[in-house]
């Protein structure tokens, strides 16, 4: 009876009183409810305006437990539909999700599911009653972890979009709600808690946000829930201050009607400034009395123990854990306490099973460390090793060796004895056969056994025979008959007059009155020693068109180049000079080569920093280069004609296409060098649609357009494209690439300017070897159509092909280097040539359309200068008996380095006189030796190629 009275009292109280702050709203709602018989939804008359452009993430959590009957469940759905009427629903305004819960949580739709209000209304009306338990805490946890995740459509916290939960429940939860609700509120979620009927009001307050009078509501039954519609319209449509003001909250900003409050994350407390947060350390603040460890938990603390200890009943002290004392350890043999746990051990002769509890007798052979090579046999307390048939056990009692019947029986095999499983047999080497006695061997004579058909020689091989020809003959295609070798016809003999076949090669011959020079190809008149009064004291030696005097052994030539004196001290003793020994009367001094200086011991040499030790005269950058130096210019500049000053490349227009060899002979490492070479050329140009336009082709067995003339308007983007260029690494179809360049690259469709604009057109073709197709046709067409062709060859590039590609004059358009180490020098020369062409094109008004104007007149290129050193002038005790060919500019640079550029304005003739100085002759000899070394290396390469060609011809 008392329970019935209490129930009636609570029902009446719930019908009369909600919360003080909402009394007027509920009173207004009740008056509306009394008029419900006149209209289906009279509360909609209160919706004077919707929450237009209001941004919010709203999730309804609906109690769908068995205590809610079908009629009440329908009332809840009507209430939700009424709330939806004043919301501005859409992806950029209010997003709506809905969960209903009983014993489990069902996600009806998430925040990202629907984009229109009509879709949400249909989904609400289709909901089915779960009719199970009341797991309110589980539903709030689901909303916190999943419903408000960005994956489900919630907007990031940094956007300050309000997150709102509206939860409707009619009974006491079957799980804990206070802790999970507090956690949700701490993350910034605003919770409205609506209780219907006999709901514990304290439970509602533990769910809803503060102040409770604005966020916690209690109605008597589900028929009265719709009276709250206008209340929520006012609360949901109020401006969210967190998104409109600079709130300065350190962790979370929580919207409250007309204002906001700051909240901290779990484990933090709000400072007195009501915006910043600090960690809440209750272990430090209170006398916790924990014996070992104190651990902070949200709003409190707990005591914990170290590993191997357990917390006593008082929750403060710690006692050691005896894990083995418990009867459920399960160890079959022995239990041993360990740190924080226990472990099982087995008696001797047993091993612990994988379950770590039971034991099994040890199978010694089953363990992987018994060491038996063939077979392991268990014994009572150990094991023993056995060998397979045909093997015997070694002294280590584990490994086995094969029984060597050949060694035991001494069978007398002439070549090889082969062991079998239980015996042996004799075997002969390849090309031999076993005699009937089964022991000795005889060579197989294939030439005698069959009609070999060789015209000249038959040669036995291991398995057969081959025909060979006598010296001076080549084997024919039938591999049997022979033809005499015409060496003069097979090779580019290079003889000046006539070529004569020899037994193994050819020889050049000269007409009467001439003799063959040392190159073995060109001819010279009879030696000067026989024709004139040479005046040599000891002996005269002809040297091509001249002669040199030589001295007998033990003597050296004097400075006059004719008379002799005894050998110098440098040759007579072990002088110890690292570089050069120079005679000085009856003694000697040590000197160093150019680029080095003498060490303190007077014998060893140390390398100079040429750029620091000389007045190099470089306007921008000096770079050490072996025993000398070279000048370089900063980006956007090119080296002037004097090799020292720098000048800015003109900004004139040009259409330039690179044709780059990407064949496998180049290699990936050298391909990177070529990319740097291209980047250096680009740096010297002004890249823009009105100035320089640049395209790039890479070719191998196919041609790939890396970028066209129209692709890039800046050097930065262009260089980035060059850096990302992938190496093709196949064949070398240079002719195909030239065809592609001629037919496509200079078309207006790919960015070339019309011929009528008279913009110069140029192509830089880079290759490192012989092309697999013809290059002349398309190179000729390109040049005939006004495209200036620059040819750059490295390594095995063929000079004839480079000449076919390059425009005239070739000394300005053809560049060759033996390896990639000199690519910088080629780059500087090429940039200089292109810049000169641009300067020239700027100054010419009537040049033919599409033709790159010829460069302005420059100082004539250095001609090869032949220097015959017949006497030593002022250089004592030094003799040069060879003739070398060098370019004049190399010699000039050498003397300029030696003189430290003290006379930069001097004429070349004045500088030539300095070549006769002793140190310059030493430099000259060093340069000559280097050139001879390079020529020798190239000669060796040509010899190897000739030998390969002869081998192919021999077996063709």
Curated annotation (Swiss-Prot):
It is found in: Secreted. Its main location: secreted. It comes from the Eukaryota. One of its GO terms (biological process) is response to axon injury. Residues 840-863 are annotated as: Disordered. Residues 57-232, 655-830 form the VWFA domain. Residues 917-955 form a coiled coil. GO terms for cellular component: basement membrane; collagen-containing extracellular matrix; extracellular matrix; extracellular region; matrilin complex. Glycans are attached at residue 221. Keywords: Coiled coil, Disulfide bond, EGF-like domain, Glycoprotein, Repeat, Secreted, Signal. Gene3D superfamilies: 1.20.5.30, Laminin, von Willebrand factor, type A domain. Pfam families: cEGF (PF12662), EGF_CA (PF07645), FXa_inhibition (PF14670), Matrilin_ccoil (PF10393), VWA (PF00092). Disulfide bonds join 242-253, 249-262, 264-277, 283-294, 290-303, 305-318, 324-335, 331-344, 346-359, 365-376, 372-385, 387-400, 406-417, 413-426, 428-441, 447-458, 454-467, 469-482, 488-499, 495-508, 510-523, 529-540, 536-549, 551-564, 570-581, 577-590, 592-605, 611-622, 618-631, 633-646. Transmembrane segments: none annotated. Residues 1-23 form the signal peptide. Residues 238-278, 279-319, 320-360, 361-401, 402-442, 443-483, 484-524, 525-565, 566-606, 607-647 form the EGF-like domain. One of its GO terms (molecular function) is calcium ion binding. Involved in matrix assembly. This is Matrilin-2. It comes from Homo sapiens (Human).
């Amino acid at each position: 009876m008392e329970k019935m009275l209490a129930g009636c009292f609570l029902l009446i109280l719930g019908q009369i009183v909600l919360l003080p702050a909402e009394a007027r709203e509920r009173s207004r709602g009740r008056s509306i409810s009394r008029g419900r018989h006149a209209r289906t939804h009279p509360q909609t008359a209160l919706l004077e305006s919707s929450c237009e452009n209001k941004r919010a993430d709203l999730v309804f959590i609906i109690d769908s437990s068995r205590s809610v009957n079908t009629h009440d469940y329908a009332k809840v759905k009507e209430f939700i539909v009424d709330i939806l009427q004043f919301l501005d629903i859409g992806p950029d305004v209010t997003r709506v999700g809905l969960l209903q819960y009983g014993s489990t949580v069902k996600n009806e739709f998430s925040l990202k599911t629907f984009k229109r209000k009509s879709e949400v209304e249909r989904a609400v009306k289709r909901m089915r009653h779960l009719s199970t338990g009341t797991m309110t805490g589980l539903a709030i946890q689901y909303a916190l972890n999943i419903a408000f995740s960005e994956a489900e459509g919630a907007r990031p916290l940094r956007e300050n979009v309000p997150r709102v939960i509206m939860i409707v429940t009619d009974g006491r939860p079957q799980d804990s709600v206070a802790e999970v609700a507090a956690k949700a509120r701490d993350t910034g979620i605003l919770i409205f808690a609506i209780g219907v009927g006999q709901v514990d009001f304290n439970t509602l307050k533990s769910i809803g946000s503060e102040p409770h009078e604005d966020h916690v509501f209690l109605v008597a039954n589900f028929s009265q829930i719709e009276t709250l519609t206008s209340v929520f319209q006012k609360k949901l449509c109020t401006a969210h201050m967190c998104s409109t003001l600079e709130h300065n909250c350190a962790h979370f900003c929580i919207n409250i009607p007309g204002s906001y409050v700051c909240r901290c994350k779990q484990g933090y407390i709000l400072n007195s400034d009501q915006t910043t947060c600090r960690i809440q350390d209750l272990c430090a603040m209170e006398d916790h009395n924990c014996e070992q460890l104190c651990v902070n938990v949200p709003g409190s603390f707990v005591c914990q123990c170290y590993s191997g200890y357990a917390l006593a009943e008082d929750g403060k002290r710690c006692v050691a854990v005896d894990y083995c004392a418990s009867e459920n350890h399960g160890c079959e043999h022995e239990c041993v306490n360990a740190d924080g746990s226990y472990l099982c051990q087995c008696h001797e002769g047993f091993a612990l099973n994988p379950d770590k509890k039971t034991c099994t007798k040890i199978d010694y052979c089953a363990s992987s460390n018994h060491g038996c090579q063939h077979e392991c046999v268990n014994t009572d307390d150990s094991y023993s090793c056995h060998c397979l048939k045909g093997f015997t056990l070694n002294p280590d009692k584990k490994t086995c060796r094969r029984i060597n019947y050949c060694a035991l029986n001494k069978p007398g095999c002439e070549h090889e004895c082969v062991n079998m499983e239980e015996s042996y047999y004799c075997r002969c080497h390849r090309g031999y056969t076993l005699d009937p006695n089964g022991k000795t061997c005889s060579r197989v004579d294939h030439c005698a056994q069959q009609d070999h058909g060789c015209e000249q020689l038959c040669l036995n091989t291991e398995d057969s025979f081959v025909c060979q020809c006598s010296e001076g003959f080549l084997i024919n295609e039938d591999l049997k008959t022979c033809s005499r070798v015409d060496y003069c016809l097979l090779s580019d003999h290079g003889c000046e007059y006539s070529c004569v076949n020899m037994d193994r090669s050819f020889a050049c011959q000269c007409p009467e009155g001439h003799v063959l020079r040392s190159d073995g190809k060109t001819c010279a008149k009879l030696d000067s020693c026989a024709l004139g009064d040479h005046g040599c004291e000891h002996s005269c030696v002809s040297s091509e068109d001249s002669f040199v005097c030589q001295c007998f052994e033990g003597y050296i030539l004097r400075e006059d180049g004719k008379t002799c004196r005894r050998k110098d001290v440098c040759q007579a003793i072990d002088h110890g000079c690292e570089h050069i020994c120079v005679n000085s009367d009856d003694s000697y001094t040590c000197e160093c080569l150019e680029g080095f200086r003498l060490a303190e011991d007077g014998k060893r040499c140390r390398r100079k920093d040429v750029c620091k030790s000389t007045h190099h005269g470089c306007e921008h950058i000096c770079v050490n280069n072996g025993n000398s130096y070279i000048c370089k210019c900063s980006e956007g500049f090119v080296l002037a004609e004097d090799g020292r000053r720098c000048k800015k490349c003109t900004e004139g227009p040009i259409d330039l296409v690179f044709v780059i060899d990407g064949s496998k002979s180049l290699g990936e490492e050298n391909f990177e060098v070529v990319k740097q070479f291209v980047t250096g050329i680009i740096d010297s140009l002004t890249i823009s649609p009105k100035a320089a336009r640049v395209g790039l082709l890479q070719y191998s067995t196919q041609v790939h357009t890396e970028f066209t003339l129209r692709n890039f308007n800046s050097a930065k983007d262009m260089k980035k494209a060059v850096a990302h260029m992938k190496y093709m690494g196949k064949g070398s179809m240079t002719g195909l690439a030239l065809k592609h360049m001629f037919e496509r690259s200079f078309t207006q469709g790919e960015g070339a300017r019309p011929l009528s604009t008279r913009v110069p057109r140029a192509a830089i073709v880079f290759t490192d070897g012989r092309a697999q197709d013809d290059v002349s046709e398309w190179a000729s067409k390109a040049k005939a159509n006004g495209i200036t062709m620059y040819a750059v060859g490295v390594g095995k590039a063929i000079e004839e092909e480079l000449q076919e590609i390059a425009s005239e004059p070739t000394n300005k358009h053809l560049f060759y280097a033996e390896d990639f180490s000199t690519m910088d020098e080629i780059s500087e020369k090429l940039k200089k040539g292109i810049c000169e062409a641009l300067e020239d094109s700027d100054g010419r008004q009537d040049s033919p359309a599409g033709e790159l104007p010829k460069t302005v007149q420059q100082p004539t290129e250095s001609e090869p200068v032949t220097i015959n050193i017949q006497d030593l002038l002022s250089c004592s005790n030094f003799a040069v008996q060879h003739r070398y060919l060098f370019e004049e500019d190399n010699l000039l640079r050498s003397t300029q380095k030696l003189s430290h550029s003290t006379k930069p304005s001097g004429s070349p003739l004045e500088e030539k006189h300095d070549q006769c100085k002793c140190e310059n002759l030493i430099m000259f000899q060093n340069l000559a030796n280097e050139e001879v070394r390079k020529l020798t290396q190239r000669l060796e390469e040509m010899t190897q190629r000739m030998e390969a060609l002869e081998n192919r011809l021999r077996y063709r």
